Amino acid sequence: FKPQIAYFAAIGAEKQLENICAHIRSNYPTIPIILDAKRGDIGDTAKMYAQEAFDRYGAHAVTVNPYMGGDTIEPYLVHKNGAAIVLCRTSNAGSGEFQSQMIGDEPLYKHVARRAAHEWAKHGDVSLVVGATYPEELAEVRAIVGDMPLLVPGVGAQGGDPEAVVKNGANSQRTGLIVNSSRAILYADTSDPMSAAVAVARKTRDTLNLYR
């Protein structure tokens, strides 16, 4: 379950998000809650964002932006209840503007992957965001990080290919992927949204499992 916090905060519905997360924890305790916040700030501010994600909302993990450096990631990793999912090679069309810039002989997203795997992971639970819309880069990141979990958005409305995601992103155990489809499920059919969402979610799951 991956709620995007901005959609709740924009209309003053943070309490509703608290209630939804509490419902998930109580009734579906095996389902992880990932707070999609993409936070990126330093020191004490990052500690407060970690407190918000893990103590207020009870999330198991939160998406974070590494642009300001590793000290902005650590507060999430050392929090007793938390894990950080670091933006690496994101699914949006403009992601290459910075993420593909060469630093030495490698693009920036590879540097982020190496730092996450070899440095930040020493301090706690860390994983990476790598978009389904860039399957070749997904394979490159997997080669760098080993069996680390990857959050993979972009299957569904953004056009990511499930077969390519599994082929390029699965780890040595043929797992290690948290594949995210949002709009394709949420807006599957306005006439019967609940049934349509269930059908699309199951179809997406079954398609991914087909290629494992």
Spans of features found by a protein language model:
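Alpha-helix-loop-beta-strand connector modules within alpha/beta enzyme cores
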Residues: 14-35, 145, 150
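A general structural detector for well-ordered alpha-helical segments in enzyme core domains, enriched
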Residues: 16-20, 49, 53, 112, ...
